[in-house]
C-alpha cells in the first residue's frame, strides 16, 4: 500500500510538471522603455589588495603601464580606474612566522605601522580604504584561526579589549 502511494504521488508530480511545461503562452518579454539608461556606478568599489606592496617595493619590484612606462603602483592602479584599496593587518606578523613552515616575515610586513603607511599613501591618492583585520600573527582563514602569541593567555574580557585596541 505504501509503495502504491509513493508511485501515485510521483506520477502526480510528473504529470503536474508536464502540464505546466506544455503551456501555449506566446507572451513576449517586456523590456523597460529606456534601454539606454546609464547607471551611477560611483558607489561601487573597484579595487585591489595591495597588502604586500611595501615588501615588493623594497625587493625592487617595478610596475609598468601597457606602453612600458614605469609608475608607482597605487598611481598606476588609480589611472586604470581603481577607486579602492584593501589592506591586510596582522597583530604581530614577525611573531607568527617560521622558516620551517615556509613563512618568514622578520620585518613585520602587514603590521599596524606598515598598513598605516600604505593607507596614508592610498588616502592621498583619493582611494577608499578597506582594512582586512586578521586577528592573528599570520594567515587566518576558516581552517586556521590562531590567536596572536601576545593574546594567547588573555581572559575573555582582556581578549575583547585587545581586539578593540587593535
Map each language-model feature to its residues.
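Hydrophobic alpha-helical segments
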Residues: 14, 45, 116-119
